[in-house]
Amino acid sequence: MDSEEFRRLGHQVIDWVADYRERVARGEFPVMSRVAPGEVRAALPAAPPVERQPLDGILDDLANIIVPGCTHWQDPRFFAYFPSNSSLAAVLGDFLSTGLAQLGLNWQASPALTELEELAADWLRQMLGLSEAWSGVIQDTASTATLVALICARERTTDYGAARGGLQASERPLIVYASSQSHSSVEKAALLAGFGRANVRVVPVDDRYAMRAEALQKAIAADEAQGNAPCAVVATVGSTATTAIDPLEQIAGVTRAHRLWLHVDAAMAGSAMILPECRSLWSGIEQADSLVLNPHKWLGACFDCSTYFVRDPQHLVRVMSTNPSYLRTAADTRVRNLRDWGIPLGRRFRALKLWLLIREQGIQALQQRLRRDLEHARWLAAEVDAAAGWRRLAPVPLQTVCVRHVPAGLSGEALDAHTLGWVRRINQSGRAFLTPAMLGDRWMVRVSFGVEATEHQHVVALWRQMREEAERGS
């Protein structure tokens, strides 16, 4: 393919994507894919082609085979999981990143990649109202950032002994603390960082599903009495199930008293802190050691773009640094080598999409959109509160509303069957997509707002469909 053919085919692909996005915004596809397991693969040739194939035929396969196998995360009727916005400016940034084909092994390998990532992370820091004490880097996902945080915590607790001698260097079991509402990535990070699942303590939550600081204090004291080594606390700002917010100020008081690392997982909810009126939700954040939030979720920077902030970058670099001779340069003492800020040696030019998003939309437009999403959640919460037979199961600090329809006389497994039944009918209709989740030992339904194209009319239509399906025959 020469540059002229690339130009011609590139226009064709951009047109295809633009048409697809317009069709998604109009609701022309079922929101959740209806394909059966294995259906997409079975529709495609099992062996690779020997000769080149024309793009027209490839785009036909894309439209007829691939798209039906896609769940449409940018559909305005998508209320499942969490928002994972892909703003068009960020899409172009991703395209430019791939076209520039930069590989960030060190500063010299791509000075622009390194310095734009520093800048984009610092822009976001300013937008969030964080102090200059924080330094940021872009990781792929919050799972990776949490793993890096726990490795840093491990090395601080062992005075870098684990890095030198492995897990055998610690004479006492190292303990990690997180609430029952924390993300599953915390357990995986503890496993991969060598703590082991048995050394993750699940701290009880209060009636708002937030970690109880006094319970954390008791758990730490119990471990110390047993001769264990408390190491790190992972607090959550915006839990996956209910967007519960752990009390960072109180938790930080406990971690300071015991010299524990405090990592804050604000993967989805952190974007809300570009709104000054939301920042009280993470009061105490300046006392944390590390923080992760994902601009590829609510903000719109396209997956994957997860920002990891630390207060002690020198410690991070010491923990993560490798310095083979073939990567050393004369500039090393004057620049940031991002290979030492995380796990991978190389990195994509992820900063381009975040930089383009912020420049093309501006802070004001981003704030406006997030405020609209918060209003959608407040509207639905009020409707649920006023409707007979409906229960709102958790506070609504941000954009997720947790609900259950409870017909008279229905409880236990019968109520679970009812809940799963009406949400399944909504999802199968193709007119909306919701995800159920367990709260305690019973099923409920999460309504998560945040898709860029969602307007009030879509929220009204969803509530109407929820009532139709749940109240049918009750």
How should these model regions be labeled?
Residues M1-A133, R424, Q428, A432, ...:
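N-terminal entrance/gating region of PLP-dependent enzymes' catalytic architecture
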Residues R392-I426:
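Conserved PLP-binding catalytic core of the aspartate aminotransferase-like
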Residues P436-S474:
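PLP-dependent enzyme catalytic core of the Aspartate aminotransferase-like
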Residues L88-E171, Y177-S179, S185-V186:
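Well-ordered mid-protein domain cores that form the structural environment of catalytic cofactors
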Residues P395, T400, Q428-R446:
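Conserved PLP cofactor-binding pocket of PLP-dependent enzymes
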Residues H258, S283-A388:
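Active-site C-terminal subdomain of aminotransferase-like
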Residues T141, A145-V317:
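Conserved PLP-enzyme active-site core in the AAT-like
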